[in-house]
């Protein structure tokens, strides 16, 4: 029987999320297609919640000018711990049987996207599982 495990992670790390659509365009283009979690949790005249998770959306460039200003408001805890690789094997008389996996688990308080990626529109890391048989001749 054999076993291998590898964790990777990052601590004391912040993620600046002000490049998030629909705020990416700043003063140039008003908000058009809005991510659902922003549309559901933004400040508006109809919902003047001072603790709204996201700032005002707008249809004119004057409405959204301050949304991309760098601020600690946009900082989020980007710490994470990932089970990067796991392999379990069993030796048989003429070889070995094994199961291995990559990117199986992630623990993080940041839930908008994978904190190991550079931004919200990066391709996600693939989760893979392999089952194998090694034979010795």
Model regions and ranges:
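C-terminal beta-signal and terminal closure region of outer-membrane beta-barrel proteins
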Residues: 41-51, 68, 106-137
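Transmembrane beta-strands of outer-membrane beta-barrel proteins
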Residues: 1-5, 95-99, 131
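Structural signature of outer-membrane beta-barrel channels/translocons
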Residues: 89-93, 100, 134-136
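Extracytoplasmic gating/loop element in the C-terminal half of outer-membrane beta-barrel translocons
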Residues: 12-95
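Short, surface-exposed polybasic-and-hydrophobic patches located at secondary-structure transitions
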Residues: 95-105, 125
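Outer-membrane beta-barrel channels and translocator barrels
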Residues: 1, 10, 92-95, 126
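Transmembrane beta-strands of outer-membrane beta-barrel pores
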Residues: 7-13, 85, 101-108, 137
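Hydrophobic, lipid-facing positions within transmembrane beta-strands of outer-membrane proteins
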Residues: 1, 83-88, 127-131
């Amino acid at each position: 029987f054999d076993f291998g495990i590898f964790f990777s992670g990052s601590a004391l790390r912040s993620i600046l999320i002000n490049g998030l659509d629909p705020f990416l365009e700043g003063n140039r283009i008003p908000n058009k297609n809005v991510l659902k979690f922003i549309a559901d949790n933004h400040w508006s005249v109809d919902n003047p919640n001072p603790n709204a998770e996201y700032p005002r959306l707008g249809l004119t460039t004057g409405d959204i000018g301050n949304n991309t200003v760098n601020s600690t408001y946009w900082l989020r805890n980007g710490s994470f711990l990932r089970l990067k690789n796991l392999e379990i094997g069993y030796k048989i008389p003429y070889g070995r049987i094994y199961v291995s996996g990559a990117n199986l688990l992630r623990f993080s308080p940041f839930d908008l996207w994978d904190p190991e990626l550079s931004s919200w529109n990066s391709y996600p890391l693939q989760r893979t599982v392999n089952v194998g048989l090694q034979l010795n001749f």
